[in-house]
């Protein structure tokens, strides 16, 4: 999939595991825009925008799969199937300097804050760096360095907070044969040593 040539992107990654996040979209004044929300598996679960919800100002609370609670008046709930959420917004732009400025002004009016900070000034906390991760190494190379057990152990932890879709049940049944079950720790005893060694070769053969 190629990036759009006639839109400017507005994107964010956030975790709704601890609490919902609230997205405030300004009045787009009829301008075409869409704001797909993707779960941890990049499945789109909601798409507010001109075609679906119009261009007036609107506010949404993106909640996690296990969240239950009350939202402020005027805030609509969008429930994410996973804790990890990717907002991948696109706003139409003609490409002229004047329209770039107009879209940038709209982008500056967007707000994305934790529910506990909604309606109040919010300053994101300083980020932290995991020093155990080589930030100069590509993701592909980092994954390729992992053993099969390391990879499936990490995947099982991620699947606890980011459950696979129900439509993936047939594949999940196959994964269980090697000890990978959604919601549980990885059972390395079910992964045969000879198969673990062959996994990189099998993966490469399937891709090629």
Residue ranges and their predicted role:
Residues 1-208:
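A compositional/structural signature for long, glycine/proline-rich flexible linkers
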């Amino acid at each position: 999939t190629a990036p759009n040539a006639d839109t400017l992107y507005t994107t964010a990654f956030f975790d709704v595991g601890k609490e919902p996040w609230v997205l405030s979209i300004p009045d787009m004044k009829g301008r075409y825009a869409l704001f797909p929300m993707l779960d941890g598996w990049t499945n789109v679960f909601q798409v507010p925008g001109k075609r679906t919800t119009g261009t007036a100002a609107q506010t949404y609370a993106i909640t996690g799969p296990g969240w239950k609670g009350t939202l402020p008046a005027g805030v609509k709930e969008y429930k994410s199937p996973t804790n990890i959420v990717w907002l991948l917004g696109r706003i139409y732009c003609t490409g002229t300097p004047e329209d770039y400025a107009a879209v940038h002004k709209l982008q500056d009016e967007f707000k994305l804050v934790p529910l506990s900070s909604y309606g109040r000034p919010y300053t994101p906390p300083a980020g932290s760096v995991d020093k155990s991760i080589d930030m100069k190494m590509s993701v592909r190379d980092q994954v390729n360095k992992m053993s099969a057990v390391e990879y499936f152990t990490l995947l099982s932890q991620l699947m606890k907070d980011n459950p696979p879709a129900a439509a993936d049940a047939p594949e999940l049944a196959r994964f269980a044969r090697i000890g990978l079950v959604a919601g549980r720790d990885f059972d390395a005893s079910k992964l045969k040593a000879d198969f673990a060694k062959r996994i990189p070769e099998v993966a490469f053969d399937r891709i090629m």
